[in-house]
Structure formats: structure tokens, C-alpha cells
């Protein structure tokens, strides 16, 4: 396990997210608050600073290193579950005063060669958020066919050279055996991508695609968003920070879908299903934060409030 004290993580939109979640800059109202993606605990610690004695904070994370970091928090108001945030659905109905989701990969995950998330470091081609279960990227690439590989890279990486990359992976597998390290994959992708985007490593989209796929990130996000509707109490807030267009599109469409009345075309005279969310805000990091933490550049936070009308 990596030493999380040496791999620093700067929390993106720290105060903005907590203020949006709590409905202002003052003390948190009493209730149960959810940090659905604990990471290295930046948001959780800030929420606890604002939480009254009767408040509670429940966090989720499937990364064993995040659970290790959470053990350093001795506050009795805090608890964490070693599971993905799709398990929000296990919480009691209308029990949460607010839910925060900070999507994507933390700096310690990216900067740990043994986790295999980054083409910048040579390490095992793993990319699992939860290293205690599931198959690694290397294991999947060792058996997937060309069509499957191309589909994943195209869908989750929006990579126009997905076909050539998939063929190169299959050819390498047939000639020399499966890919096992991040450097091997990065070099292979660089040879298959014929044109380069300025300022971007040619392997960026492929690594993103494989990470999203192997962790079922978009499916988990959709499940967690759906669960939030049931778990949020009326007036409770949902704040979601995303880092790429695929995530943000899902969040944007989800909020839009539930921020309007829905009519049943099969029953034109029936009362419409009431709106269940009210869109509140869209916030991006300011120039100062981006200068201090370039990884914040792509972040966008969307905030919505659960309406008073029962679902």
C-alpha cells in the first residue's frame, strides 16, 4: 500500500463544494451528510469542521488506500463504508441532508506507479479503484477481442484511432504476449495514433477509456444519481464535481430530466409527475485555483436541490 502521507492530493473546489452542499458558509444544519467519494478526505474534513454535535457524516470509497486514510479520522460523527457510491441505494429513504460526489481519480492514485493509472510512470497495467476485487486492465486486454477493445476505447475515450489501437494491442498479444505494464501500452498507442493533439499525450484517451471501463465508472455514477433521489430528504442538496465531458453530460442530463414535470403520453389527462430536483448552480474553479492546481482545470460542479414534492 502506498504511503498516502507522501502522495499529496489537493482537493478541487473545496470551499465551493462544501458551501454549495451545506447551503451557505455557516455551520451545517443538523442531519446526515454524505461524502460519496471520500478520496483522501479533503471534503469530509471540511464538512466535519462545519458540522454540529448532532450531525453525522457518512463516506463511501472502494479504494483500500482511501479506507486506510479515513482511519486517521477519529471523529465519532464520521463513518466510512468500503464500497462504491452506487451503494447509496442501501441508505434509508429521505435520510440525507446532502450528498457530495467528487468524481475521477485522486492525485495519489495517479501518481502511484503501482496503481497503473498513468502513462507517466512505469508500473503494472492495473487501474482498478478497488485492488481487492475484479480484473485488471492487463487481464482484460489479454482476452478481449479487437472489436471489444475498439468499442471501449471509442466509447469511453472518444478516441478516433480506437480501431488501429485495438488492432495494435491484438497484434502485440499474438506476437509477444499480453501487455503487462503502463509503459508498454503507452508506447504501443503512440505508434498507432497518427496525428497528435497539442499538449496531450497520445495515450491520454486510451488510458481514460480503459480506466472508466474496468471500474464501470459511468454505470456507477448513473446508479448513484438515481439512488440520490430516493435518499435525499426534501430540501437536501446534491453537488457533483466531474472532470471530463462523459461524466458531466450524465450529471447535466440527469438534473435536467428531473428538473421538469413529466407527462405520460399514454395518459394525456393524468396529472404530470412532479419535478424532483431544482437545478441551482454550475461552478468552475477560478483562475487562482487552476494556477495552483492545474488538474482542476477541467472540473465542473453542478448543484441541485431535492424538491419538497414527494417522489
From Swiss-Prot:
Keywords, alphabetical: Cytoplasm, Methyltransferase, rRNA processing, S-adenosyl-L-methionine, Transferase
EC number(s) on file: 2.1.1.199
Entry-linked Pfam families: Methyltransf_5
To which species is this protein native? Paracidovorax citrulli (strain AAC00-1) (Acidovorax citrulli)
Q: Which domain of life is it from?
A: Bacteria
Q: Which InterPro entries match?
A: RsmH, SAM-dep_MeTrfase_MraW_recog, SAM-dependent_MTases_sf
Q: Which GO terms describe its cellular component?
A: cytoplasm
Q: Where is the signal peptide?
A: none
Q: NCBIfam families recorded for this chain?
A: 16S rRNA (cytosine(1402)-N(4))-methyltransferase RsmH (TIGR00006)
Question: What name does the UniProt record give this protein?
Answer: Ribosomal RNA small subunit methyltransferase H
**One Gene Ontology biological process:** rRNA base methylation
Name the chemical reaction catalysed here: cytidine(1402) in 16S rRNA + S-adenosyl-L-methionine = N(4)-methylcytidine(1402) in 16S rRNA + S-adenosyl-L-homocysteine + H(+)
The entry lists its GO molecular-function terms as: rRNA (cytosine-N4-)-methyltransferase activity
Q: Which family does it belong to?
A: Belongs to the methyltransferase superfamily. RsmH family.
Q: Where in the cell is it found?
A: Cytoplasm
Where, by residue number, does S-adenosyl-L-methionine bind?
41-43, 61, 85, 102, 109
Q: What is its main location?
A: cytoplasm
Q: What's the stated role of this polypeptide?
A: Specifically methylates the N4 position of cytidine in position 1402 (C1402) of 16S rRNA.
Amino acid at each position: 500500500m502506498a504511503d498516502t502521507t507522501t502522495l499529496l492530493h489537493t482537493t478541487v473546489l473545496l470551499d465551493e463544494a462544501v458551501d454549495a452542499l451545506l447551503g451557505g458558509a455557516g455551520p451545517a444544519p443538523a442531519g446526515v451528510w454524505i461524502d460519496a467519494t471520500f478520496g483522501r478526505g479533503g471534503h469530509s474534513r471540511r464538512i466535519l469542521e462545519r458540522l454540529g454535535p448532532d450531525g453525522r457524516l457518512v463516506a463511501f470509497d472502494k479504494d483500500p488506500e482511501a479506507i486506510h486514510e479515513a482511519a486517521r479520522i477519529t471523529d465519532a460523527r464520521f463513518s466510512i463504508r468500503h464500497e462504491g457510491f452506487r451503494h447509496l441505494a442501501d441508505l434509508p429513504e429521505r435520510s440525507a441532508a446532502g450528498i457530495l460526489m467528487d468524481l475521477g481519480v485522486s492525485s495519489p492514485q495517479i501518481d502511484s506507479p503501482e496503481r497503473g493509472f498513468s502513462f507517466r510512470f512505469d508500473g503494472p497495467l492495473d487501474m482498478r479503484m478497488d485492488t481487492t476485487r475484479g480484473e485488471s486492465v492487463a487481464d482484460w486486454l489479454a482476452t478481449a477481442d479487437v472489436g471489444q477493445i475498439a468499442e471501449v476505447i471509442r466509447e469511453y475515450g472518444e478516441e478516433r484511432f480506437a480501431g488501429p489501437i485495438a488492432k495494435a494491442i491484438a497484434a502485440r498479444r499474438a506476437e509477444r504476449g499480453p501487455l503487462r505494464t503502463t509503459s508498454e501500452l503507452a508506447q504501443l498507442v503512440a505508434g498507432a495514433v497518427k496525428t497528435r493533439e497539442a499538449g496531450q499525450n497520445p495515450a491520454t484517451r486510451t488510458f481514460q477509456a480503459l480506466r472508466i471501463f474496468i471500474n464501470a465508472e459511468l454505470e456507477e455514477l448513473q446508479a448513484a444519481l438515481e439512488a440520490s433521489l430516493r435518499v435525499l430528504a426534501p430540501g437536501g442538496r446534491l453537488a457533483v464535481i466531474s472532470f471530463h465531458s462523459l461524466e458531466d453530460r450524465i450529471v447535466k442530463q440527469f438534473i435536467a430530466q428531473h428538473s421538469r414535470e413529466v407527462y405520460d403520453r399514454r395518459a394525456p389527462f393524468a396529472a404530470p409527475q412532479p419535478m424532483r430536483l431544482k437545478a441551482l448552480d454550475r461552478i468552475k474553479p477560478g483562475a487562482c485555483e487552476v494556477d495552483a492546481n492545474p488538474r482542476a482545470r477541467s472540473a465542473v460542479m453542478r448543484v441541485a436541490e431535492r424538491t419538497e414534492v414527494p417522489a
